Every structure is written in C-alpha cells, then in structure tokens.
A protein has these predicted regions:
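Conserved catalytic cores of very large enzyme subunits
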Residues: 1-245, 266-267, 271-380
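Contiguous, well-ordered alpha-helical segments that form the cores/surfaces of helical PPI scaffolds
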Residues: 249-262, 283
Length: 380
C-alpha cells in the first residue's frame, strides 16, 4: 500500500502503478529475508553456537507468500558474503503437496523448481512429503530443528494445534551396548533392553517433573508473552502448557546397525530376519512410549536421535568397555538411528527403500539423508 501511494503520485496509469508497487515490495521482501539470514548467521550463544532455527515453506499460494518463498530461496542460493558461503541456518524445509507444487500445472510448481536449483548448489532445502507427514504424525507440521516432530493434537475446543507446543527433552538409548552385553544371546538382549527402557522411563519422567517446577517468571517470553501459545499469569502452573499430551518428551535411540551386526554379521541389510529384529526394537520402544503417555498424560514419542557427538561418545565408551570389535567399535562411531551403513555406499534409492519402514515407529523424530555428487548440471 505504501509503494502504491507513492506510485499514484509519480507514475501515470494504474497498470504501471501496480507494477511499480509490486517491484518495490518484492525488493523489500528480498531485503528482509536477506537480513534475517545474515542476522541468524551472525548471532551466537555464549558458547559460540548459532541458534538452530528452521523455516518451513512451500504451501503458501497468495502473492505475498510466493514472493517470500522465492526470496528465501534466492538468498540461500546466492550465499553469504563475498565468499558466497553456504549458510547452515536457518534450516530450510520445503513441503511437497499434491495440487500445490508437485506437478507442472500446480500454482507453486515454479517455486519447487527454484527449490531444486537451490538444493543442487546449497544442499538445502530439505524436503517434506505433506501426505506422508500427516500419515505418520497425525497432522502436517515442519520439524523442530532437523527431525523432531510434534504429534497431532487438538485443544479443548477441538482445534488442531501445532504452534506454541514444545518438546521437553530427550533421553537416548545405546542399543549397541545392549547387544554387546548380551553376547549375541537374543533372550539376554531383550531382558537387558527392558531394564534399560525402565531406566529411560524414570529419566524422562524426572525430566517432565523437573520442568514443571519452573514458574512463568523464569522465562516470561515463553510462558507469559505467548511464545508457548498461551499467556500464563505469574502464579499459574506451567504444567498447563504441557499436560494432556500437549507437550512431547522423547525416547531416543542410536545404533540399530551395530546392534544387528552383533547377531547377524556386518552385511545384514538384505537379511529379512535381521531387518525384522531391528524393526522389533523400534516397535517395542513405540509400544512402551504409548503406554507411558497414557499413564502420565504427556506425549512420549520415539525419536531417531541426530547424535552428531553421541555417535562418537557412545562408541568411545563402549570401546573402553568391550575393546575394538570389527564393524562395531572399530569404526570409532555408531550409525545414526535406523540409517543404512554409510561404508557400503548405497545409492539414494537403495538407502530410502531400506529405511522407509522405520519412521512409522519413530514418528517423534526421523530423517532420510542422502549424499549426492554434483547435480548442478542435472537438477531433474
């Protein structure tokens, strides 16, 4: 409206006035998105970390929504500074939806093409399949961070709510250690597994109870000013924001590959019995978290821990305890969650086909990650 008023003063003809206003607004949007990206990448915590922020987009079809999405992708494609460095944050996540951007006649198909071009140059955005997220989590939402998903939830009025909800924390289970302690005995494995799940349950419940001890004045922006979706008074209980499964709390896990290697050898990925064993692990975790959620009134979910540092830490600790074991501790890392062993260099189709059965049991957090050669000459 501001630019249109200026155009009416200096430009003749309604069509030219509208074109002028749109071009000026388009530049404002680009500058705003560029400022946001630079601001996030020059903001650091006391220990030198950049805030982990995530932008989800792809679905908005009105003029402003489309221009914002274009600007986000143009800024990321251009890169940071004179060196044109690839920005890590904010993490970009593009949603693919039938009727919106999947096919050539969809209104946002051109933005999807822009997203593909951006991905060939910057490895971002990540991609979400709208229908699959609804199927797995109960409603559509982009993840918190890179893979943490809220589950579908309705308030007391029957309204579906995602904004303002939160995760209260994660406790991660070292699956390879259980397998090593069992010495390849399936019965021993499941007995130890049950014992460790009980410990995880206690830790998660403690986490919830400890969080409930906060008061709204401890974090006014979150509790009193609406960041968590409601405005609490100074004396209100913060549990009002957590209970009735509004908040999630997550049971993480790591190292399905190494655990199965103990029982079936290093090349077990094509062994149906071994695959069923790993699926049983996450299936049992899912059954436990569902039961805990019904017992305590908070949404316990299974989470495929990203564990950039935990892959090293768990493996290092187990090397000290069990020594160097071929294909397990000798790598000096554990494989993330349900991922395919990267040493085998599977192509993207093999990797996704292998991993696709797991997210139904760990919808609290999952990601399929593939590395590609230079695709700039072949975006299709």
């Amino acid at each position: 409206e501001k630019h249109l008023e200026t155009a009416k003063e200096w430009v003749e003809g309604e069509a030219k006035q509208i074109a002028y206003a749109e071009e000026k607004t388009r530049k404002d949007i680009y500058d705003a998105m560029q400022s946001l990206e630079y601001e996030i990448n020059t903001l650091y915590t006391s220990n030198g970390q950049t805030p982990f922020t995530t932008l989800g987009f792809g679905l908005g079809t009105d003029w402003f929504a489309r221009e914002i999405q274009k600007a986000v992708l143009q800024v990321r494609t251009k890169g940071l500074g004179k060196e044109r460095r690839t920005a890590i944050f904010p993490k970009l996540i593009f949603a693919l939806k039938k009727g919106t951007n999947l096919e050539t006649h969809d209104p946002n198909y051109d933005i999807k093409q822009l997203a593909i071009t951006c991905a060939t140059k910057r490895m971002y955005p990540d991609v979400l399949m709208y229908d699959k997220i609804v199927e797995l989590t109960g409603s559509f939402k982009t993840p918190m961070g890179c893979r943490s998903f809220l589950q579908g939830w309705e308030d007391e009025n029957g309204n579906e709510v995602n904004s303002g909800r939160m995760n209260l924390g994660v406790v991660t289970l070292n699956i390879p250690r259980i397998a090593l302690e069992s010495e390849g005995n399936p019965e021993a494995f499941w007995n130890i597994f049950e014992e460790r799940l009980a410990i995880c349950k206690d830790a998660l419940v403690y986490r919830v109870e400890r969080t409930k001890e906060a008061t709204p004045t401890n974090a006014p922006i979150l509790y009193q000013h609406g960041a968590f979706g409601k405005r609490l008074g100074e004396t209100d209980k913060v549990d009002e924001l957590f209970k009735n499964k509004r908040a999630t709390v997550s049971l993480g896990y790591i190292g399905l590959y190494e655990a199965a290697t103990v029982f079936y050898g290093a090349d077990w990925e094509t062994n149906p019995e071994a695959k069923a064993f790993t699926l049983d692990i996450v299936k049992k975790m899912k059954e436990k978290t569902d039961a805990w959620g019904n017992q305590y009134g908070y949404h316990f979910s299974v989470y495929s821990t990203p564990s950039e540092s935990l892959t090293d830490r768990f493996c290092s600790m187990d090397t000290e305890k069990f020594g160097i074991i071929a294909d397990i501790t000798d790598k000096e890392y554990y494989t993330n969650s349900f991922h395919y062993d990267v040493r085998k260099n599977p192509n993207p189709f093999e990797k996704i086909a292998f991993e696709m059965e797991y997210p139904q049991y760990c919808s609290g957090g999952f990601i399929h990650y593939c590395e590609y050669p230079n695709l700039q000459q072949n975006p299709k």
